[in-house]
């Protein structure tokens, strides 16, 4: 299956930000990767506009991406390219990022409400584009940076499921898009080797939303790239820095492994038991806390015989649902409740809160308060990075 290089993918993900200006869109579509307009001036490519913002507040229609037919060397290939977050539309994109509820996509899988709304607002135009190009499509390339990466993930999943075309996904600094069910299902639909998730170590955006949202490919690290910039600076999220990190490299060369064994159970237990201080401004803390939260919730679910993913479907907030599960864990046997206690102590310490002395103090109300503070802190770091784009 044809595959574009990291350098080309990063160039397209960077230059697509011009999509908000109709004149610059025409210049973008003159890149050699796309089919040119015919002699009469008619272009086979389509400029996409999406609804971004809140459901009522700052709900605007804005240039968001393109559907493009491949040019020389890319014949019979389709490109779906989406821009990332920008503040040029009165920060409506930030509201899209902040709509962190769960909704179901067309396959009934749980995904991020804001990202799903943004994608489905463009879907009629995307469907028309595919109807106009029903020929022998060799491959569909879906790509984007930041918010654009999240939307590209939903687009790639839709293409693979609906049209069964070979599909490639390329994302840079993308946030999490769906829950465990979606991550597992979309990995099966696209296949792990066709999913290129690139992220910097200190980019805060791929760290959100917190669990139950998870990255795809399922059980895959993606293309991890070391970065030393402070988490709070937002510098590691800039597309220009991603372009610099991947230039002159192949996908196989972008295979660094995170320096800590975040997904090994014994290592997670060791981190939870450790007396070493934790700092919410550290990228390592967010990796550890994400793995530890999943580890503890799954321990509770196994003993209490509950489906974690089923719990997250419903009207209550995610903080309410996770607090419910953790509070249930406090009441279970010591071999389970101790992990809830250690987890909450770690989070409270990192957030500068008064640490609970014992598990009796860890009421459902307090647990919820801690989780809300944790979520607010994670979202603040991500939104700070987005505002600096």
Residue ranges and their predicted role:
Residues 1-39:
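Charged, compositionally biased non-catalytic regions
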Residues 15, 70, 83, 200-201:
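Structured loops at beta-to-helix junctions and adjacent beta-edge loops in soluble globular domains
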Residues 38-143, 160-167, 189-194:
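A conserved cap/lid and substrate-binding interface adjacent to the catalytic center
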Residues 76-77, 124-139, 157-389:
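Serine hydrolase/lipase
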Residues 85-87, 149, 176-177:
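Short, solvent-exposed loop/turn segments at secondary-structure junctions
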Residues 88-90, 152, 180, 210:
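Active-site-proximal flexible loops/turns
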Residues 123, 152-153:
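Short, hydrophobic/amphipathic alpha-helical packing segments
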Residues 143-148, 152:
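Gly/Ala-rich beta-loop-alpha elbow adjacent to hydrolase catalytic centers
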């Amino acid at each position: 299956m044809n595959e574009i290089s990291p350098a080309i993918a990063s160039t397209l993900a960077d230059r697509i930000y011009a999509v908000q200006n109709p004149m610059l869109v025409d210049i973008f579509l003159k890149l050699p990767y796309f089919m040119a307009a015919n002699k009469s001036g008619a272009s086979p490519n389509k400029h996409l506009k999406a609804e971004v913002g809140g459901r009522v507040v700052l709900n605007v229609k804005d240039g968001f991406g393109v559907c493009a037919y491949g040019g020389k060397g890319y014949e019979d290939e389709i490109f779906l390219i989406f821009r990332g977050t920008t503040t040029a539309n009165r920060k409506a994109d930030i509201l899209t990022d902040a709509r962190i509820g769960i909704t179901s996509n067309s396959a009934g899988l749980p995904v991020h409400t804001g990202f799903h709304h943004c994608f489905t607002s463009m879907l009629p135009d995307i469907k028309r584009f595919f109807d106009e190009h029903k020929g022998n499509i060799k491959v569909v390339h879906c790509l984007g940076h930041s918010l654009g990466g999240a939307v590209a993930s939903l687009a790639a999943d839709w293409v693979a499921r609906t049209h069964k075309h070979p599909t490639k996904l390329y994302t840079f600094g993308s946030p999490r898009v769906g829950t465990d069910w979606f991550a597992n299902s979309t990995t099966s639909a696209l296949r792990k080797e066709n999913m290129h998730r690139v992220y910097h170590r200190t980019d805060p955006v791929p760290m959100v939303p917190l669990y139950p949202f998870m990255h795809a490919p399922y059980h895959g690290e993606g293309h991890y790239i070391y970065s030393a910039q402070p988490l709070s600076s937002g510098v590691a999220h800039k597309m220009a820095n991603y372009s610099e990190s991947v230039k002159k490299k192949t996908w196989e060369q972008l295979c660094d492994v995170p320096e800590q064994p975040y997904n090994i159970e014994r290592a997670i237990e060791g981190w939870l038991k450790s007396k070493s201080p934790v700092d919410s401004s550290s990228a390592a803390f967010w990796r550890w806390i994400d793995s530890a939260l999943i580890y503890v919730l799954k321990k509770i679910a196994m003993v209490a015989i509950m489906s974690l993913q089923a719990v997250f479907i419903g009207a209550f907030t995610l903080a309410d649902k996770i607090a419910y599960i953790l509070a249930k864990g406090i009441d279970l046997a010591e071999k389970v409740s101790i992990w809830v206690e250690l987890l909450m102590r770690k989070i409270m310490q990192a957030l500068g809160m008064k640490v609970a002395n014992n598990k009796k103090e860890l009421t459902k109300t307090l647990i919820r308060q801690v989780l809300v503070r944790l979520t607010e802190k994670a979202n603040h770091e991500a939104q700070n990075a987005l505002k600096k784009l």
